[in-house]
Amino acid sequence: MTIEILGTGPEIIKNGTRGVEPVIEEVIKNARKEIKIAVYVLTSRALHLIELLADAAKRGVKITLILNARTCRDKEISLKLDYLVESFPHVRVINFRSLKKQLHAKVIVVDRNTAIIGSANFSWGGMYSNYEIGVLVEGNPAWEVAKILDQLCLIN
């Protein structure tokens, strides 16, 4: 099992801590079988990450995005996600709706072996301008996080 601390903000990442966004890019590019993402906010300022997901879909990677239906309403993102779902049968977008709770997680799991868990939304603030902290975990904990995301898919 491997654990690495990630962050955003120049004062945080200058001390050898890797940035959240470059690590997200890296794990998406390295995905071979599956990507699961749960996120509270997804905006067009993170469109490049959606492009990376499109590249992964072209490689045959199964992708599941679980989005908070109340906060993920960016039109440009919606059009791109609709295109991905229509173009690739192995891409699934779940607009999480619950009368009791909101989806507030910010999690990515790749191949059930690598997970990024943190505070950063898929937005300009989350990737660049806010101070965010996250962890990259590899091994069994990533598998456990994937199982939680599987359960979230069933709740909706």
Segments and roles (model prediction):
Residues 1-25, 30, 43-156:
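PLD/PLD-like phosphodiesterase catalytic module centered on the HKD motif
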Residues 39:
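Short acidic, glycine-rich surface-loop motifs adjacent to enzyme active sites
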